[in-house]
């Protein structure tokens, strides 16, 4: 399966908190933003682990144990372009975090999880700041869907959009 990523930490933050503006997060409510280092770094670590632990089958295992990335062409959809999206391919039925750990990359250098504590008010404030940075549904979904999502959020969050 393909896992969607973005090259922008602000877009990642938007996707992490975008649904929480309508919920009142109680104690212990968190959203998560995951950080992924350059895939060349991860793949080099995976290869060195294979050389160290299974040198006889290096060529065979290297083909199977590298994280593959897919960068879509701009012509596919404007949505992927505006989200700075790319995808990683992982084995079916396995989370990327588990797959990396199973292949010798279990430390915190490979995937960084940033836990963002939130309340309804803090998420609304965060979304207001992100929209001032031009990160909102209208720019992330450049079509009717984005305009409708923006309007629905703007009705409920005071000062969300400069037009309202």
For the regions a protein language model found, what residue spans apply to each?
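Catalytic-core elements of nucleic-acid end-processing and repair enzymes
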Residues: 1-164
């Amino acid at each position: 399966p393909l896992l969607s990523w973005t090259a922008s930490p602000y877009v990642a933050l938007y996707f992490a908190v975008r649904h929480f503006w309508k919920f009142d997060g109680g104690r212990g409510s968190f959203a998560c933003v995951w950080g992924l280092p350059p895939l060349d770094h991860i793949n080099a670590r995976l290869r060195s682990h294979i050389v160290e632990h299974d040198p006889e089958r290096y060529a065979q295992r290297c083909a199977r144990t590298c994280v593959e990335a897919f960068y879509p062409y701009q012509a596919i959809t404007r949505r992927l372009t505006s989200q700075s999206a790319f995808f990683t391919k992982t084995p079916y039925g396995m989370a990327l975090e588990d797959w990396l750990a199973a292949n010798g990359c279990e430390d915190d250098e490979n995937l960084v999880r940033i836990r963002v504590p939130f309340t309804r008010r803090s998420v609304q404030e965060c979304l207001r700041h992100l929209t001032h940075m031009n990160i909102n549904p209208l720019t992330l979904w450049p079509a009717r869907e984005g305009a409708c999502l923006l309007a629905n959020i703007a009705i409920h969050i005071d000062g969300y959009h400069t037009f309202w």
